[in-house]
Amino acid sequence: MHTNTGGAKGTIRFDKELGHGANAGLQNAVGMLEPIKEKYPDISWADLIQMASAAGIEAAGGPKIPLRFGRRDAESDNEVPTEGRLPEGDPPYHQADGETPLHAATDNQDHAAHIRRVFYRMGLNDKDIVALSGGHTVGRAHSNRSGANRKDATLYTENGPGTKGGQSWTENWLEFDNRYFTMLKDESEGKTNDDLLKLSTDYVLITDPDFKPYTEAYAADKDKVCKIEHQTKYESILSRIIAAVLCSSSRTTRNHIRSCLS
């Protein structure tokens, strides 16, 4: 917020930003939206991405999220943010801020400090961070994309729709629900499922004393997750869920997204 850079202005369409390490695989999501952009050229990329995010969440069983429109697109890749301002899943962590965000952080083993540094800058608070992380209930991690997965395929992904394999955070990784949070609670109680992905920045949500109450609240009440738009700065969250929803969608879900946008 204090840098007046970044934000929802469609810069992900530029190769410069798609080339950032944290965005590996997002060319697939952008590619899915290109035919819609061509059909409706007057809609901005920024609005289209937000619409796709909302439609994808709804198609996955999540809430219907109201949207506001009128975002303007960046005119060139000169407006692409500096690489390194997104969070990592495991240490050692980079600074993720300032003029050299890819440089090692002095607290490069502190999971909670890392994600707070990233998301406080965006104006989010601890409750928002936990809610945002809940987007991991949808989607998978692949070796040739984020590289965050521990396994190339699991019981839940080896025969899934779309690209086979990868590792998901939940068993039903095309459903928008609170399983991500119940998985973290299970893990904290010793109920481990090695087929499910758990990053260091996931697990800290159930161990950090300030994150933990929100994680437990979402784990206890599915409806809290389905009312996420009332509990969080939802427009800040939508564009970050798009990767999971669009890149991991089945054909039925993709068609629903397109029908919502067309």
Predicted features, each with a name:
Residues 1-262:
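Catalytic cores of secreted/periplasmic or lumenal enzymes
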